[in-house]
């Protein structure tokens, strides 16, 4: 990144759970603080000062001339509303994925950001992980025959985090980033609420008609894990080796956001990123529709 801006961008962090706390920590990073000035945080709870960061009301954050940027780090169900409010107030927005729980809402938010001339950045730290870098290298130049990605974890509240195709959109983003735009073939949902168990099974297809399956399985006792199986004409990949610790991935995401604020990301790159994000959200909406139709 080039020289410091004449005035730092004032930032508020909305939501101080795990992601919000990491964002507050990274905003204090010496490199980032050359460009960003942490003004305060917004929370529904009355918490007072946190790590010498003052709590401010949502109304003050929206109204303040000091605030240029909002980081939205709340549960997914509230992302759309917060993004809309801050864009309407003329603020730039960084939001944890997914930005919204429907494709239509995401389209509206992008249009609003364009109307207001503001940066709308959806975080995708999964694309900054060492595992993804390894997969990108393994996939490059090879002809895909078929593949599958299965994710297991403990139960997640759908009311807060959305339908599994949305709460699991980072896995879908991996598949799209590795294999290009995908077509939806089928989607089914097994749901046993009394056992807190769910399994979503999605069949997708690449533009070259190679099949990909994506499974999200959540229930008590299931460990957080990704199971990958990719078959090429030249061989297969059945697991991702331990490729090292994912260091500072939120900070790397913040650096990308700063580059956008400074106008250092090309229009072509911005358009490609927006296209990928909307493609994934459209697939997620279609998957949800198919699963609900079959229940």
Swiss-Prot record:
Gene giving rise to this polypeptide: Blvra
Location of Phosphoserine modifications: 154, 177, 229
Record's keyword annotation contains Ribonucleoprotein: no
Chain residues in the propeptide: 1-2
Protein name: Biliverdin reductase A
GO biological process, one term: inflammatory response
Entry keyword set: Acetylation, Cytoplasm, Metal-binding, NAD, NADP, Oxidoreductase, Phosphoprotein, Zinc
Catalyzed chemical reaction(s): (4Z,15Z)-bilirubin IXalpha + NAD(+) = biliverdin IXalpha + NADH + H(+); (4Z,15Z)-bilirubin IXalpha + NADP(+) = biliverdin IXalpha + NADPH + H(+)
SUPFAM superfamilies documented for this protein: Glyceraldehyde-3-phosphate dehydrogenase-like, C-terminal domain, NAD(P)-binding Rossmann-fold domains
Subunit architecture: Monomer.
């Amino acid at each position: 990144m080039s020289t410091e801006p004449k005035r730092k961008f004032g930032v508020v962090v909305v939501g101080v759970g795990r992601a919000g706390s990491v964002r507050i920590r990274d905003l204090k990073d010496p490199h980032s603080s050359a460009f960003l000035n942490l003004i305060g945080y917004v929370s529904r709870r009355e918490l007072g000062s946190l790590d010498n960061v003052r709590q401010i009301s949502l109304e003050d954050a929206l109204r303040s001339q000091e605030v240029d940027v909002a980081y939205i780090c709340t549960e997914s169900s509230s992302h759309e509303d917060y993004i809309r409010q801050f864009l309407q107030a003329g603020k730039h927005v960084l939001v944890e994925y997914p930005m919204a729980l429907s494709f239509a809402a995401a389209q509206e938010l992008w249009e609003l950001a364009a109307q207001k001339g503001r940066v709308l950045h959806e975080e995708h730290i999964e694309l900054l992980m060492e595992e993804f870098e390894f997969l990108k290298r393994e996939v490059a130049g090879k002809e895909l025959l078929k593949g599958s990605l299965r994710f297991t974890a403990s139960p997640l509240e759908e009311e807060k985090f959305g339908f599994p195709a949305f709460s699991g959109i980072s896995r879908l983003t991996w598949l799209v980033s590795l294999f290009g735009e995908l077509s939806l073939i089928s989607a089914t949902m097994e749901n046993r609420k009394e056992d807190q168990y769910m399994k979503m099974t999605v069949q997708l297809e690449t533009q070259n008609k190679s099949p990909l399956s994506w499974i999200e399985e959540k229930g008590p006792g299931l460990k957080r894990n990704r199971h990958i199986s990719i078959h090429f004409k030249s061989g297969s990949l059945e697991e991702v080796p331990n490729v090292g610790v994912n260091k500072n991935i939120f900070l790397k995401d913040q650096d990308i956001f700063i580059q956008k604020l400074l106008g250092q990301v090309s229009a072509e790159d911005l358009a490609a990123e927006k296209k990928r994000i909307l493609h994934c959200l459209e697939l997620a909406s279609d998957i949800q529709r198919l699963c609900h139709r079959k229940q």
